[in-house]
Amino acid sequence: MENRQFEAMLAVAQERLAQHAPEDIAEKAGTQYADGSFSLKTLEQTVTVRLSDCTIQPPLSKWHALTLLHYLDLADGTPLTGRTITFSQYKDGLVRGGGLDRNAELIVRRDLGILPPEELERRCGSLGAELLPSNADFCARFDFAPRYPVWLKVWFSDEEFPASGRLLLDESAPHYLTIEDAVTVGSLILDQLTGAQHWAV
């Protein structure tokens, strides 16, 4: 059932992409377009997306690939604001986004926040994250797509408090992906940082 549902979503994404001028997509999504394919970087991997059949090389997990196609379809070129929001502050994000916010907090407290900082840095680096100064003990910026950054902020545990943390998005994020897609992006990043395989197929 889930596979049929996924195939249907993929077919819709392909149809929608075919309705745009490719040069228009490239400009709004911040990608390159040449020889019938888009080229872009996603979480440290440079991939090409062939417009004719939406195949992606090198291959990505199916939900990663579908979300990237949605990004190319929905991107409207809105500039990044530099102001961050939580997933629950996303347009229509109260339920789905709030769930991701709580899940991220739990994963930081249980898994990521108890790692030695160098190990967390190594895991973030494997996804191409850039470490940034911030008000948290640890802050990394992941680029899911050229105009879709995600920040992980972690406060490590001490004698008084357990570790805490959150994933954040730029305020412009709803111009590029729906809340459902945003939750997929957050889940993909958390999965890869913890070694879980929920979204890896």
Could you describe each region identified by the protein language model?
Residues 1-35, 64, 71-130:
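Short Lys/Arg-enriched alpha/beta "domain-start" segment
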Residues 115-175:
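Conserved binding-pocket/active-site segment within a compact domain
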Residues 69-76, 189, 193:
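Generic structural signal for hydrophobic core residues of well-folded globular domains
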Residues 58, 106, 110, 138, ...:
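Short, charged/polar micro-motifs that form catalytic or ligand-binding hotspots
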Residues 170-201:
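A recognition module on extended beta-rich or small alphabeta surfaces enriched in W/G with H and D/E
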Residues 24-51, 130-156:
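Amphipathic, interaction-prone secondary-structure segments
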Residues 45-70, 155-180:
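Intrinsically disordered, low-complexity regulatory segments enriched in Ser/Thr/Pro
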